[in-house]
UniProtKB/Swiss-Prot annotation:
InterPro entries reported for this sequence: Bacterial_rp_bL28, Ribosomal_bL28, Ribosomal_bL28/bL31-like_sf, Ribosomal_bL28_bact-type, Ribosomal_bL28_sf
Origin organism lineage: Bacteria, Pseudomonadati, Verrucomicrobiota, Opitutia, Opitutales
Keywords from the UniProt entry: Ribonucleoprotein, Ribosomal protein
Top-rank taxon: Bacteria
UniProt protein name: Large ribosomal subunit protein bL28
Record Pfam families: Ribosomal_L28 (PF00830)
Source organism of this protein record: Opitutus terrae (strain DSM 11246 / JCM 15787 / PB90-1)
Keyword tRNA-binding: no
Gene: rpmB
GO cellular component: ribonucleoprotein complex; ribosome
GO biological process: translation
Length: 76
């Protein structure tokens, strides 16, 4: 099962963690330098909930919390 919101289509996106070393120029150093860049994923906050469908039935779906808070989904 893909980790994708059934309502908004939110999915994991790629990003990176950037590690820096050194003292910033602002605080009297010669500047910071990038030492490593590590790949990572930003995952949406998905919850498996029972959703009321327009025809009156219910169905379990993976829904992002952002969609729940916005009122795009009605919990059964």
């Amino acid at each position: 099962m893909a980790r994708i919101c059934a309502i908004t289509g939110r999915r994991p996106v790629k990003g990176s963690i950037i590690n820096r070393k050194g003292q910033s120029k602002k605080s009297g150093g010669i500047g910071t330098h990038v030492t490593t860049i590590t790949k990572r994923k930003f995952r949406p906050n998905l919850q498996r909930i029972r959703v009321k469908l327009p025809n009156g039935g219910t169905k379990r779906m993976l829904v992002s919390v952002k969609a729940l808070k916005a009122g795009l989904v009605e919990k059964a």
